């Protein structure tokens, strides 16, 4: 089996695994590492096919979750996933109820695609991205990154930061990226997450154009024991646009649920 790239940092007693989103890699967390490393031992990974974790075929969500969990340096951890990484973390939490201490999703949805009475990204838009990747790889990735920061005061700087993360490591293949878009287009974990055993924290950006804020209220009703926080001035990447507020909120939520060691 191919090996995933893992990096472990920090000196806290609580283990926190960070899973990045579509098109990115583990460097996306740089803005919060120093803020969290005294509270957690952080485990950063490049998901299969992304960054330094090359040589993987196109994977289903279940396959990706299984590979990440099996190679994790510490399994008894809080699993935090951003965007697509939120689906991976959710799948891991559902499949490994005795190991996962808590699940935290950031700017993520158990169902990214819009359906009747469910806000999200129109499936044909995701399908269109798949086609555009084949036509103009770099332009499509740039467009997707720009969508993630749209509306924030620091949108231009945040997009530049995301682009730098992408370019700093080996680029994922068109096939890997299309596989990720297919997961976003087709996966629906809404019902399964009602059976989740561990604490579940959800963090959102008020200005997020990919995961509409209405999702938070709908899931508040569906998962009454799961606290949610909406960052008023953030979009799809609150830990980049508002790293201090994000880190403070994360710690407060973990303390409130008594999941810090």
UniProtKB/Swiss-Prot annotation:
GO biological process: biotin biosynthetic process
Pfam families linked to this entry: Abhydrolase_1
Keyword tags: Biotin biosynthesis, Cytoplasm, Hydrolase, Serine esterase
Catalytic activity as recorded in UniProt: 6-carboxyhexanoyl-[ACP] methyl ester + H2O = 6-carboxyhexanoyl-[ACP] + methanol + H(+)
Localization (cell): Cytoplasm
Database matches in InterPro entries: AB_hydrolase_1, AB_hydrolase_fold, BioH, Carboxylesterase_BioH
Domain AB hydrolase-1: residue ranges: 15-243
GO MF terms, alphabetically ordered: pimelyl-[acyl-carrier protein] methyl ester esterase activity
Enzyme class: hydrolase
GO CC annotations on file: cytoplasm
E.C. numbers: 3.1.1.85
Binding site for substrate: 22, 83-84, 144-148, 236
Active-site feature positions: 83 (nucleophile), 208, 236
Family (UniProt): Belongs to the AB hydrolase superfamily. Carboxylesterase BioH family.
Subunit structure: Monomer.
NCBIfam families attached to this UniProt entry: bioH
Its biological purpose: The physiological role of BioH is to remove the methyl group introduced by BioC when the pimeloyl moiety is complete. It allows to synthesize pimeloyl-ACP via the fatty acid synthetic pathway through the hydrolysis of the ester bonds of pimeloyl-ACP esters.
Name this polypeptide is given: Pimeloyl-[acyl-carrier protein] methyl ester esterase
Originating organism: Proteus mirabilis (strain HI4320)
Source organism phylogeny: Bacteria, Pseudomonadati, Pseudomonadota, Gammaproteobacteria, Enterobacterales
Gene name of the encoded protein: bioH
């Amino acid at each position: 089996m191919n090996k995933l790239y893992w990096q472990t940092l920090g000196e806290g007693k609580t283990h926190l695994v960070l899973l990045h989103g579509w098109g990115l890699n583990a460097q996306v967390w740089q803005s919060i590492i120093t803020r969290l490393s005294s509270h957690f031992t952080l485990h950063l990974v490049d998901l299969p096919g992304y960054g330094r974790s090359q040589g993987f075929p196109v994977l289903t969500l279940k396959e990706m979750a299984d590979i990440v969990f099996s190679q994790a340096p510490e399994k008894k951890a809080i699993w935090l996933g951003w965007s697509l990484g939120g689906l991976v973390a959710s799948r891991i939490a559902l499949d490994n109820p005795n190991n996962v201490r808590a699940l935290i999703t950031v700017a993520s949805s158990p169902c990214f695609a819009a359906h009747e009475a469910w806000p999200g990204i129109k499936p044909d838009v995701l399908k269109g991205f798949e086609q555009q990747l084949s036509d103009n790889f770099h332009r499509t990735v740039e467009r997707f990154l720009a969508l993630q920061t749209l509306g924030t005061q620091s949108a231009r700087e945040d997009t530049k930061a995301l682009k730098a993360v992408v370019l700093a490591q080996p680029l994922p293949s068109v096939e890997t990226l299309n596989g990720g878009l297919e997961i976003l287009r087709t996966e629906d974990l809404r019902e399964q997450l009602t059976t989740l055993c561990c604490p579940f924290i959800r963090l959102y950006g008020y200005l997020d154009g990919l995961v509409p804020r209405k999702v938070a209220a709908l899931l508040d009703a569906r998962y009454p024991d799961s606290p949610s926080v909406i960052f008023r001035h953030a979009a799809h990447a609150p830990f980049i646009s508002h790293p201090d507020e994000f880190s403070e909120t994360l710690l407060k939520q973990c303390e409130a649920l008594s999941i810090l060691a």
